[in-house]
Amino acid sequence: MANYYSDINEIKFELENSPLMQRIVELKELDYADKDTHDYAPQDFADAMDSYDRLLDIVGDITGNVVAPNAEAVDAEGAHHENGRVRYASKTYENLQAMNQAGLNGMTMPRRYGGLNLPVTVYTAANEMVATADAGFQNIWSLQDCIETLYCFGTEEQRQKYIPRVCAGETMSMDLTEPDAGSDLQSVMLKATYDEENGCWRLNGSKRFITNGDSDIHLVLARSEAGTRDGRGLSMFI
């Protein structure tokens, strides 16, 4: 039974010996403010580190015994088009199910939305193991961190609507690239027009080369201010 965490000492060594780790945890846990309201919230630094160690061991077990063994079959089958949607390879759904059953979604999101409230440092360690097992699957699973954008810049209504969905396992993408706008995102021309009659925005244009582009929730970059041609006329739409 392989384990990409316990079998490889590097990640554990780095977390346990980082001189900044205690401060990172204190900042993320806001002096352990959740300990009285959430049963699984850490009581102190030692408790937090023990929780991270246990969680990363679960990630290591899934990546070593599910994701990595499935990688060859995923490559052989590939994604395919079916009834207007893109379907992952069958083993990719098996990978997602294993991660979802273990509760490994919304990892950095606050507990009040159903997240695990992990520091990005710990989430990145988990991400490294997933990428080691199957870099293609890592592209799907790790795009849960698109929700950070909504958490930082969205309204509280948007947070309550979308963050719990990601924490429950729905997938995400960030739709940026267009036929004439790749690395130069200031050239994005997907047009966003406000529909006053229906109280919503209408998007008209093209996107392409979108990683995980048939996800459940999309953050779409579009030009919302008519007559602009740089980054100041762009907005992100859910």
Predicted regions and their residues:
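Hydrophobic alpha-helical scaffolding
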Residues: 1, 45, 49-53, 82-86, ...
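Internal helix-loop-helix
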Residues: 60-61, 91-168, 211-213
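Short coil/turn segments at secondary-structure boundaries
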Residues: 25-31, 70-80, 109-111, 138-143, ...
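A short core secondary-structure module
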Residues: 200, 204-238
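Extended, charge-enriched "interface" segments that sit outside catalytic cores
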Residues: 1-82, 86
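Internal maturation/activation junctions in enzymes
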Residues: 142-143, 154-190, 199
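Short beta-strand elements
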Residues: 187-194, 221-222
